[in-house]
């Protein structure tokens, strides 16, 4: 595997912004545009499955991309710096790591047409509570027993992460867990396209092989929208 950091060249910020906005051939507001743009770093025949994960962050007002890939990227544009190094984590049972994860927490369910679908865990929990009270909308719930939005986000998303951790060979230290930036991303027609949440904290390695696989393949869904990349580093 390879780990890459993509940052705009300070001497070419305008060109970098133009390349990011239009290099994918998609609308700059399209959440899928980053994915299409980063594909340019991995030239391959048509039909090749995606073999990279990415995450977009902003520091000092400038975007940066973290990318984990099965192949080394090929820099395509002078306006962006691409720093790449081999990524072969050496993990042991009991090792503690700091982690960051932007994920799309969903559960399986059935949509209004009776077909199988994925549902955002927060929205699913709200729907269940409203149904139990015979209410249609969250704003209709006026009682003192109405849960706080952030409490619901933390409870439902942390439960989702705990289940994912069991599948992927690690255990989250609940005392260090942060659940932030719950966002419902909307598509071009203003409908909700997907949701994301940022997790951070410390974890303990239980199964190195499973965790290494998760570092390369990601956790959860919406990977084409910048979710699923688990970033780890030693606890110092």
Predicted regions and their residues:
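RNA-interacting cores
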Residues: 1-236
């Amino acid at each position: 595997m390879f780990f890459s950091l993509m940052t705009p060249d300070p001497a070419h910020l305008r060109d970098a912004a133009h390349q990011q906005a239009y290099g994918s051939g998609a609308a700059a507001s399209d959440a899928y545009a980053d994915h299409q743009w980063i594909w340019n770093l991995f030239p391959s025949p048509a039909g090749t499955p995606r073999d990279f994960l990415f995450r977009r962050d902003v520091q000092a007002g400038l975007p940066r991309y973290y990318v984990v890939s099965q192949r080394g990227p090929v820099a395509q544009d002078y306006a962006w710096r691409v720093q790449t190094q081999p990524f072969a984590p050496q993990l042991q049972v009991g090792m503690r790591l700091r982690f960051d994860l932007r994920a799309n927490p969903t559960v399986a369910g059935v949509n209004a047409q009776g077909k199988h679908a994925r549902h955002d865990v927060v929205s699913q929990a709200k729907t269940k509570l409203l149904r139990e009270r015979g209410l249609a909308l969250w704003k209709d719930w006026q009682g003192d027993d109405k849960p706080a939005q952030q409490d619901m986000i933390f409870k439902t998303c942390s439960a989702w992460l705990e289940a994912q951790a069991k599948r992927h060979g690690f255990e989250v230290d609940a005392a260090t867990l942060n659940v932030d930036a719950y966002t419902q991303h909307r598509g071009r027609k203003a409908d909700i396209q997907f949701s994301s949440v940022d997790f951070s904290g410390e974890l303990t390695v239980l199964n190195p092989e499973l965790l290494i696989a998760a570092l390369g393949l990601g956790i959860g869904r919406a990977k084409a929208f910048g979710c699923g990349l688990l970033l780890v580093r030693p606890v110092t």
